[in-house]
């Protein structure tokens, strides 16, 4: 009889260990998923662009567009200055462009 009780106790402890191991694995899995969600939120659009790009060409095109936008941003202040200089040279033109009558 004592052999049966020892075997039963061993089976129970093995089951308990297995259940505990599964719980620990589930908890680790949940932590990993939460970590991934946080990383996705932090990276946001960057990850989406990388995942949707199937080959390097599509990704390169996006970089070229970014460079063009940066160049346009750089030109913005220079164009504004040039327009202001023209307005100073021709005040009547400035008034008509702003909607006031000349």
From Swiss-Prot:
Keyword Transmembrane carried by entry: no
Pfam entry (one): Prothymosin
Keywords from the UniProt entry: Acetylation, Immunity, Phosphoprotein
Residue(s) carrying Phosphoserine: 2, 5, 13
Signal sequence, start to end: none
Modified residues (N-acetylserine): 2
Record GO biological process: DNA replication; immune system process; negative regulation of apoptotic process; positive regulation of transcription by RNA polymerase II
Region feature Disordered, mapped onto this chain: 1-102
GO molecular function: histone binding
PTM-bearing positions, type N6-acetyllysine: 4, 15, 92
Biased composition (Basic and acidic residues): 13-37
Alphabetical list of PANTHER family matching this protein: PARATHYMOSIN, PROTHYMOSIN ALPHA
Protein family (similarity comment): Belongs to the pro/parathymosin family.
Physiological role: Parathymosin may mediate immune function by blocking the effect of prothymosin alpha which confers resistance to certain opportunistic infections.
Name assigned to this protein: Parathymosin
Gene: PTMS
């Amino acid at each position: 009889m004592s052999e049966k009780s020892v075997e039963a106790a061993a089976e129970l402890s093995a089951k308990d260990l297995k259940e505990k191991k599964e719980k620990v694995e589930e908890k680790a899995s949940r932590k990993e998923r939460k970590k991934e969600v946080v990383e996705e939120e932090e990276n946001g659009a960057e990850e989406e662009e990388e995942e949707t790009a199937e080959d390097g060409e599509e990704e390169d095109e996006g970089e070229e567009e970014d460079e063009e936008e940066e160049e346009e941003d750089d030109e913005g202040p220079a164009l504004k200055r040039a327009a202001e200089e023209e307005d100073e040279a021709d005040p009547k033109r400035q008034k008509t462009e702003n909607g006031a009558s000349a």
